[in-house]
Amino acid sequence: MIRVCICGGGSLAHVCAGVLSFQSEVEVNIFTRQPERWSQHIIVTDHEGKTYKGNLNVISNNPQEAMHDCNIIFLCLPGFAIESTLECIKPYIGNAVVGSIVCSTGFFFTAHRVLGNNARLFGFQRVPFIARTTEYGHAANLLGYKPQVSIAVENMEDKEEFRKIVESLWLTPTKLLHSHYEASLTNSNPILHTGRLYSMWKDWNGELYSHNILFYKEWTVEASKTLIAMDKEFMQLLDVLPVTPGAIPSLLEYYESHDAISLTEKIRSIVAFQDITSPMKEVDGGWIPDFESRYFTEDFPYGLKIIIDLAKENNIHTPNLNKVFEWGMSKCMKKSET
């Protein structure tokens, strides 16, 4: 029996809870600030109608209770919550492996600082599922699987055996990365999201939109040009870090494209992305950007910032990354000051 404690209550936490607890040899605990909102039973439905019905073992806001006898402690948390959560659970980790579904917001760097360099850690390079909560604590939709995921693993005697466990638990072909940099640094959310947001709203001056823009389906060539410029600088950073060539493909390579036009067509056509909207909020008369969305509060100060800081440390010139970062942070700072 494998016992997993999932920390968090977002969409990915819901889907992981359902998929893992559906498996007969897995027990799932939930560590959450809102245990009263969770049911002992969870249902996850994928895009083809397959359902994962699971029973949750322990649901608690008490870390000692939630972590008891767990083999794996798995964080499904926003970047700002990682350090405080690790500090909170540190006394109760015991021999468990600590992992994160997202590493691009600093999981490994923070875990090294809080738990020490000998902690047993793992983390995904990209999330294994596209997830949306439909009823908090009860149900979620699994909108898409990944054909393959990659994980970084540290301080484990048999990394291959652990890779097999992850592959089995998350129902996705899994390969091992060579260093935590390969999981921590990604051109997914920190560049894909931020570049798109910059292209959408860098010149926004208060006008109303008639609808919530579809983030991917209404993708623009301008957004693709911004991404390609940012990604080129990101690739220059990877060249000077202990990253295996090809471990983190360029965005053009990942999306099987060769220029801004083909990248735009590819992103617009991804079925699992079709209904994903932009971080906007409805007001009288229309829609406006929501600068308090996690797209801003997560991807700029925790995702893109890691890349910016490493580039500075390694003397990599990143004018496009800097431009987008400074714009995004100016929006975050304005909201934090109100």
Language model regions located:
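Nucleotide donor/acceptor-binding cores
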Residues: I2, A96, P147-V149
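Active-site-lining helix/loop region of Rossmann-like oxidoreductase modules
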Residues: S150-E253
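NAD(P)-dependent Rossmann-like dehydrogenase/reductase catalytic/cofactor-binding core
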Residues: G206, S210, K217, S224-T338
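Internal, well-ordered alpha/beta segment that forms a basic, Gly-enriched binding/recognition surface
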Residues: G116-N117, Q125-T172
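Glycine-rich, highly charged phosphate/nucleotide-binding loops
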Residues: K50-E65, G79-E87
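NAD(P)+-binding Rossmann beta1-loop-alpha1 motif at the extreme N-terminus of oxidoreductases
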Residues: M1-K53, E65-M67
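Rossmann-like NAD(P)(H) cofactor-binding subdomain of soluble oxidoreductases
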Residues: I72-L75, G79-A140
